[in-house]
């Protein structure tokens, strides 16, 4: 038994399922999860001391790589002044100014401690500002675990939502409408059915929780236009894509302007940080200037702000996103080339520092229903083969992969050589 396996057995005695977030349990791929001891650059190290080239990146935040010296130095310096004050600090002001300078649609921003808090608060604000109750989301998109967002489509994608988790009353879930991602007709159908009741659309501009699904041309702008037509707010959830797809997020990359934006992951530099911001007239509706209540004991924590600012400053380096995109393209297209070489059907998507691969004969994946038809057994086999080769991918066929600036030529080469060997063995076994 490895030390990771022993720790997992020990953890299950005191922690539900042995983990503090379900995907970490490896239920999507089978086997026992790795317990991580440390990380540096492009590598993580498990409790047994084995090194892995990491394409999870703490689920997105580690865009510069693990344990970056500038972020580490900023955190250590901040710790000298205290861990938490529960009062305003200059660091919060600096972070707000940095975010606003990088994302043109954000005129004011409020810090929170997680992506879930950000989306939950943005939706409450949208409901309060519009005085409407219903929200519109998309099947396969994840926006955190707030009750109103853990809703899937019922008997069809255009029906009223049903709870997708026990503990969510149906009377509450009925205010969440679910449309088909990358399908404007499904959105218009709902707006025509509820023309004065929908407060907002919330959308992952690149869906990263059904693997990696970019928007088709015109989709995001179509949502913007419909929100304007029916008086709803457009919330772009950039918790995953913010400062990862481009310096101004996916909204800048695709040229669409939301009313509100939610952020997380990258802005924390590895610390627990979220944020929501947007039009000043909407943000002024939040307490203490407005009637919509939102608060948080650790919001704007000085250690987290210091880590985030150090990372955000580093992301302003010229040419960084072009270099990151080139690394991502090489990995995604390298996986596809190896799969083609060995006669294993695969489709790929990638944008900025995100990528996805799908074991399927479908040429292009643009919707959730296509993702669910992919070959999960092939994914599991590939996953464990890559893990044995020292490459750590997301342990779920429904999660995006992430590159960092720490992934160099050697890491990319080793990863693609490993993929070639694993896919060759899969072809032999089949």
Curated annotation (Swiss-Prot):
Reactions listed under catalytic activity: (S)-4-amino-5-oxopentanoate = 5-aminolevulinate
Disulfide-linked positions: none
Segments forming a coiled coil: none
Pfam families: Aminotran_3 (PF00202)
EC number: 5.4.3.8
Residue numbers of N6-(pyridoxal phosphate)lysine PTMs: 265
GO molecular function: glutamate-1-semialdehyde 2,1-aminomutase activity; pyridoxal phosphate binding; transaminase activity
GO terms (BP aspect): protoporphyrinogen IX biosynthetic process
Pathway(s) served: Porphyrin-containing compound metabolism; protoporphyrin-IX biosynthesis; 5-aminolevulinate from L-glutamyl-tRNA(Glu): step 2/2
PANTHER family according to UniProt: GLUTAMATE-1-SEMIALDEHYDE 2,1-AMINOMUTASE (PTHR43713), GLUTAMATE-1-SEMIALDEHYDE 2,1-AMINOMUTASE 1, CHLOROPLASTIC-RELATED (PTHR43713:SF3)
Record's subunit section: Homodimer.
Protein name as it appears in the record: Glutamate-1-semialdehyde 2,1-aminomutase
């Amino acid at each position: 038994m490895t030390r990771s396996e022993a720790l997992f057995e020990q953890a299950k005695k005191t922690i539900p399922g042995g983990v503090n977030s379900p995907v970490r349990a490896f239920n999507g791929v089978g086997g026992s999860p790795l317990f991580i001891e440390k990380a540096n650059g492009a590598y993580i190290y498990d409790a047994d001391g084995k090194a892995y080239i990491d394409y999870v990146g703490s689920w997105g935040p580690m865009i510069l790589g693990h344990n970056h010296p500038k972020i580490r130095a900023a955190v250590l310096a901040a710790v000298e002044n205290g861990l938490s004050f529960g009062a305003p600090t200059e660091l919060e002001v600096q972070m707000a100014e940095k975010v606003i300078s990088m994302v043109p649609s954000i005129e004011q921003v409020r810090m929170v401690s997680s992506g879930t808090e950000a989306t939950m608060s943005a939706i409450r604000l949208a409901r309060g500002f519009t005085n409407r109750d219903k929200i519109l989301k998309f099947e396969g998109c994840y926006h955190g675990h707030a009750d109103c967002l853990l809703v899937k489509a019922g008997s069809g994608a255009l029906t009223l939502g049903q709870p997708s988790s026990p503990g969510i009353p149906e009377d509450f879930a009925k205010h969440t409408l679910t449309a088909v991602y990358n399908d404007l007709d499904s959105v218009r159908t709902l707006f025509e059915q509820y023309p004065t009741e929908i407060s907002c659309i919330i959308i992952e501009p690149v869906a990263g929780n059904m693997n990696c699904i970019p928007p088709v041309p015109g989709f995001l702008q179509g949502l913007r236009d419909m929100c304007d037509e029916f008086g709803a707010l457009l919330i772009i959830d950039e918790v995953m894509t913010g400062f990862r797809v481009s310096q101004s997020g996916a909204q800048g990359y695709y040229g669409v302007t939301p009313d509100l934006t939610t952020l997380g992951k990258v802005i924390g530099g590895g610390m627990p940080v979220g944020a929501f911001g947007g039009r000043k007239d909407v943000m002024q509706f939040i307490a203490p200037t407005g009637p919509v209540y939102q608060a948080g004991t650790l919001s704007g924590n000085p250690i987290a702000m210091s880590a985030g600012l150090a990372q955000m400053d580093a992301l302003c380096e010229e040419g960084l996103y072009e270099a990151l995109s080139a690394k991502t393209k090489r990995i995604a297209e390298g996986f596809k080339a190896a799969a083609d070489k060995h006669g294993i059907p695969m489709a790929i998507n990638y944008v900025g520092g995100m990528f996805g691969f799908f074991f399927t004969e479908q040429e292009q994946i643009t919707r959730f229903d296509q993702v669910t038809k992919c070959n999960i057994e092939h994914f599991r086999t590939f996953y464990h083969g890559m893990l044995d080769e020292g490459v750590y991918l997301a342990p779920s066929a429904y999660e995006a992969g992430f590159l960092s600036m720490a992934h160099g030529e050697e890491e990319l080469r080793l990863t693609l050589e490993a993929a070639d060997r694993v896919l060759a063995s899969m072809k032999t076994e089949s």
